[in-house]
């Protein structure tokens, strides 16, 4: 009988040679596939076709939570406007920019793609504002229970999703790149730190929960991770300005008219990529010229003043989302403790056959702290789901009635 699916020894030898050629073509500073470290050492199915980091990307893409990128805020919420960037598009931009840099430097593009596509999986609804509000709830909830105060950060939660909630068995290189991706602070040079072990990685992860400043000290453990970290900033620096215009907020766009790196998104991206390459070819670190670094730092600083910290843009988050998130956290935690099996924390989360099983022991008893469960559930929500569950639970109908979305034809009415 003809074998349709299994490779012959000759075919396997060819595929193995392809994989070895891939590693041989990499820069000496790249992360070769042969050095990938996976906690569960079992080789993935079809490992000869899907090398370690290629397999990581598949695990991320097929993660049940990956779809939710599509309705998670990048910067602008409360707009019925499909031209505004959502988290799903942002991670694709990061991946493309990082792979452009990585290709020229002969880095491992498969590792770059895995880190880039998975780096924001732990983001909450309503972007960084939602992240800070959920952290408030988590701190208050753990402290109220007599536990050490714990903090929420989206990069740490991305790792928790892959390690604890859905147990994707990603490589240590991918996980460390995701954990250390936060690029809110511009650096002129990005150099990787030693990789370490999974035990050391877990200690680092726990320290991030307990010390609110510790995550700022993290550095990626591969040059590929460094590229993704810088590409994250490149991807949003100009794009967030572009979205400001697309949101009809031209009156707020008070930016410098001329910059060394450009003022249009396409110029910012292109110029930064070129300068990084000029300074990083045959280097063990990722670098920029001092003048370019300073201009990027100033541009991002302008974004904070004009966009991220604008009082009018932030008002709906602080006036509506923040109190709703605190109310939702308290309600779901109370439902858990009362074992109210009709609550969405059970029906929509813990009863899920995939993610729910990792909160229980062999006898199906819940063994996870309620604060962790509620934090995980809220972090997994999209913007729309968050509003819908608040309405469903009638958390504050008066507050919800104040919520306004900018519609497509508002300017024509």
Which residues make up each language-model segment?
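Short pre-active-site segment immediately N-terminal to the catalytic Zn-binding motif
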Residues: 99-110
């Amino acid at each position: 009988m003809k074998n349709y699916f299994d490779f012959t020894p000759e075919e396997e030898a060819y595929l193995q040679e392809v994989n070895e050629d891939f590693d041989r073509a990499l820069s000496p500073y790249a992360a070769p596939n042969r050095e990938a470290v996976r906690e569960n050492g079992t080789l993935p199915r079809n490992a000869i076709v899907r090398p370690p980091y290629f397999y990581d990307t598949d695990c991320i893409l097929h993660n049940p939570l990956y779809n939710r990128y599509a309705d998670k805020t990048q910067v602008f919420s409360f707009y019925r406007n499909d031209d505004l960037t959502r988290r799903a598009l942002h991670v694709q931009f990061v991946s493309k920019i990082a792979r452009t840099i990585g290709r020229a430097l002969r880095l491992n593009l498969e590792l770059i793609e895995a880190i880039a596509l998975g780096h924001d999986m732990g983001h909450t609804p309503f972007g960084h504002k939602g992240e800070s509000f959920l952290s408030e709830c988590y701190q208050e909830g753990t402290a109220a229970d007599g536990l050490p105060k714990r903090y929420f950060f989206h990069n740490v939660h991305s790792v928790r999703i892959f390690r604890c909630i859905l147990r994707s068995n990603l490589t240590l290189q991918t996980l460390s790149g995701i954990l250390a991706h936060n690029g809110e602070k511009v650096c002129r040079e990005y150099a990787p730190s030693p990789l370490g072990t999974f035990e050391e990685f877990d200690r680092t992860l726990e320290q991030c929960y307990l010390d609110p400043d510790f995550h700022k000290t993290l550095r990626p453990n591969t040059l590929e991770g460094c590229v993704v970290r810088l590409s994250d900033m490149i991807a949003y620096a100009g794009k967030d300005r572009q979205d400001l215009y697309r949101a009809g907020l031209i009156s707020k766009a008070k930016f410098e008219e001329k910059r060394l790196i450009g003022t249009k998104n396409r110029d910012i991206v292109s110029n930064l990529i070129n300068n990084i390459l000029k300074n990083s070819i045959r280097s063990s670190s990722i670098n920029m010229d001092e003048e370019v670094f300073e201009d990027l730092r100033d541009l991002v600083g302008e974004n904070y003043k004009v966009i991220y910290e604008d009082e009018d843009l932030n008002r709906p988050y602080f006036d509506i989302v923040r109190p709703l998130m605190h109310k939702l956290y308290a309600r779901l935690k109370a439902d858990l403790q009362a074992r109210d099996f009709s609550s969405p924390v059970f029906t929509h989360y813990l009863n899920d056959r995939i993610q729910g099983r990792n909160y229980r022991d062999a006898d199906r008893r819940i063994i996870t702290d309620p604060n962790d469960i509620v934090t995980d559930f809220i972090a997994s929500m999209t913007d729309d789901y968050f509003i819908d569950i608040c309405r469903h639970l009638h958390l504050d109908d008066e507050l919800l009635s104040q919520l306004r979305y900018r519609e497509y034809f508002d300017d024509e009415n």
